[in-house]
Amino acid sequence: MILYHGSFLEIAKPDLVHSRPNVDFGRGFFVTPLYEQAAKWCGKFKRRGKDGVISRYGYDENWEAELKTLKFDSYSEEWLDFILNCRSGKDSTDYDLVVGGVANDKVFNTVELFFDGLIDKTEAINRLRYEKPNLQICFRTEKALSLLHFEGSETL
């Protein structure tokens, strides 16, 4: 499987040191199998006058059985709870890999409304139900990162 990471620089050797806390799936290295999604991630850097660079990695899914993995097939109550725990710094899980939907602008707005107490969980889930998830994969441990193999990059 080919995976992509959007940034302002090439990342030939991903690490966990530079990952941010309190994001969708917690601290980790985020990639996607969707080139267009990685290009969107580059957009925020390009808007700030930096380069947009998509790094490309090979990943053998057969090794996934060796990893403690959490997968979300849709935006669900479980996904919402996990996102909120991670974003609020309350995640204490030990997953190597987390796979699921990206909180894009529309999804993010719903999550924020719920997080701020302006809508309840039922309303949030109802709003998210019809959103087609973009896919992100978070490599949260060195064990998981060791399975990513850098293949090159391109500047947008």
For each feature predicted by the language model, list its residue ranges:
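Short aromatic-glycine-(Arg/Gly/Cys) micro-motifs in beta-strand/loop hairpins
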Residues: M1-V23
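Short, conserved beta-strand segments within well-ordered enzyme catalytic domains
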Residues: L3-H5, F30-V31, R56-G58
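Short, charged/polar surface micro-motifs in flexible loops or helix N-caps
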Residues: E10, Y35-A38, E61-A65
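Surface-exposed loop/turn and secondary-structure junction residues enriched for glycine/proline
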Residues: P14, S19, G28, R140-E142
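Extended catalytic/binding region for NAD+/ADP-ribose chemistry, centered on the ART fold
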Residues: R20-F45
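Conserved NAD+-utilizing ADP-ribose enzyme module
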Residues: V23-D24, K44-L156
